[in-house]
Amino acid sequence: MPAISMKELLEAGVHFGHQTKRWNPKMKEYIFGERNGIYIIDLQKTLKMFKDAARFVGEMAAQGKNVLFVGTKRQAQEAIAEEANRCQMYYVNQRWLGGLLTNMLTVQKSIKRLKELEAMASVEGGYAGRPKKEVIRLERERKHLDQNLSGIKDMPGLPDVLFVIDSNKEGIAVKEARRLGIPVVAIVDTNCDPDEVDWVIPGNDDALRAIRLFASKIADAVVEGRALATEQDFTADKIISDETPAEEGMMEYTEYVDPKYAEKIMAESLSMAEEPAPPSQRKGPASETAEPVAEPAVTESGS
């Protein structure tokens, strides 16, 4: 399974949480300390919990299960699409359409409509004989559907796992998954509720580098899991035991790094880091604000 190091997490700014006035008390056990009004996430726990989550995703992928990558905030959109495509999985990176999971039949009708419009547009003369205004309307409809559904149009039914960037922003997706018993793996910042997530990965869910790091590692877990599935006499235990020496060494370091040493390098990192942004701004490197939410193209109550 993919390895991840303390150095990678520090360089990506994974340890920067939200302002101390914006936090969820349930995240207390994952907090290392506080610096200049910003909570610092305990990367020791992030390392271990990422390893557990990645192993779970790899096991599911090895069993032929499908993973849906979800990240609609602006700084997550590109990484989510790229990594999901790389591991041949599915994604939602624009809008989470209400009822996407709980009213899948309705969403599939929209997907069917998208494929009809794509087929029409791909054939020369597909719009022949139609008024110009109608052609413009159909193209507008096709582009709108493609923007919202392109990442799931080939998904064969409900996903088996959700990988989520920011469980707060994607709260509707998390609730729908929980209602259907679909496991949720999520990057959970200091302002989130970890009880809503099955596999918690404590970390910065706003920094571009942190998002890309986690998305790429989860995609690696899917790729490696699928590769193991092709081996003869595969068992779930083999995922745990069949690691290359290099990977095994890294995972040993990841899980058993001395707590005092971990605290030391985190403290050194913080002392050398630049001062956090003023309280009115978000923390950490490469942070961006989320895009304003617009009304979804498909609206279902999710009942």
UniProtKB/Swiss-Prot annotation:
Q: Where is this region: Disordered?
A: 267-303
InterPro entries (alphabetical):
Ribosomal_uS2, Ribosomal_uS2_bac/mit/plastid, Ribosomal_uS2_CS, Ribosomal_uS2_flav_dom_sf
Originating species: Solibacter usitatus (strain Ellin6076)
- One Pfam family assigned to this protein is Ribosomal_S2
SUPFAM superfamilies from the xrefs? Ribosomal protein S2
Indicate the family of this protein.
Belongs to the universal ribosomal protein uS2 family.
Q: What is this protein called?
A: Small ribosomal subunit protein uS2
Keywords recorded for this protein, A-Z: Ribonucleoprotein, Ribosomal protein
Could you cite one Gene Ontology molecular function of this protein?
structural constituent of ribosome
This protein's GO CC annotations: cytosolic small ribosomal subunit
* HAMAP family for the chain: Ribosomal_uS2_B (MF_00291_B)
Q: List the disulfide bonds.
A: none
